[in-house]
């Protein structure tokens, strides 16, 4: 299919009249010049183990829910039981811990209200066996037929089952292509957490520090 001149002209007129679609504030002023919330975009979070990839993602998702009432659909097999994940979100929402070892922890009433809020804004899908990326996306779409969703998260992509006899490059290329098409169809925010490969974990700079990982 070739895009017609009329389609292009109408698009250009719309941009001239209404401007480009811009992101909205994260509620974190120092971050906004570099990153904002915008539907229809893919955000990939990567980094070495235990540096806070999931925590960073959850906090941003929580802020989007708190500011704009976003509803999220997640696949996060490394963060079970689900109750612990809801506690993390509730603590972020309140800005206080629920840990009984802290004297200034959140009150029980506020804690339970925050957990209820988290459950209303975050839905977690689980599978009995490790799914493929296509199976996860299909399950997301089935759920989205009955519930309006603003954002999606897969954490991590590496956990998903890869086809046999397919190179890692081809697998990730196809997976990201399918994710992009999903985003275009549904106009959602999409967070994708990716662990760096073994080779990236082994690399060191001349001073012995690890270089920043990439895809």
Pin down the residues of each PLM region.
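Phosphate-binding/switch region of NTP-binding enzymes
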Residues: 32-34, 174-215
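Cytosolic-facing regulatory segments adjacent to core modules
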Residues: 32, 67-148
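Phosphate-binding/switch loop-helix module in NTP-utilizing enzymes
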Residues: 123-185
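Switch/connector loops and helix/strand junctions flanking conserved nucleotide-binding motifs
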Residues: 81-86, 95, 161-164, 199-205
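The Walker A/P-loop phosphate-binding site
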Residues: 2-96
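Conserved, well-folded catalytic cores of nucleic-acid-processing
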Residues: 64-67, 88, 92-96, 146, ...
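Generic enzyme active-site microenvironment
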Residues: 76, 153, 193
């Amino acid at each position: 299919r070739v895009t017609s001149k009329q389609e292009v002209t109408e698009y250009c007129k719309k941009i001239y009249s209404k401007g480009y679609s811009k992101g909205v504030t994260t509620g974190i002023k120092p971050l906004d010049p570099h990153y904002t919330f915008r539907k229809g975009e893919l955000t990939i979070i990567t980094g070495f183990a235990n540096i806070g990839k999931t925590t960073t993602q959850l906090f941003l998702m929580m802020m989007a829910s708190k500011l704009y009432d976003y509803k999220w659909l997640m696949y996060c097999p490394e963060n079970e039981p689900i109750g612990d994940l809801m506690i993390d979100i509730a603590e972020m929402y309140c800005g206080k811990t629920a840990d009984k070892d802290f004297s200034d922890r959140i009150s029980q009433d506020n804690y339970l209200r925050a957990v209820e809020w988290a459950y209303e804004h975050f839905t977690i899908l689980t599978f009995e066996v490790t799914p493929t990326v296509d199976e996860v996306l299909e399950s997301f779409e089935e759920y989205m037929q009955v519930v309006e969703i603003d954002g999606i998260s897969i954490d991590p992509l590496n956990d998903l089952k890869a086809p046999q006899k397919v190179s890692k490059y081809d697998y990730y290329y196809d997976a990201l292509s399918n994710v992009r098409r999903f985003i275009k169809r549904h106009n959602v925010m999409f967070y994708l957490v990716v662990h760096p490969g073994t080779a990236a974990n082994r690399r060191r700079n001349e001073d012995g520090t690890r270089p920043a990982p990439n895809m």
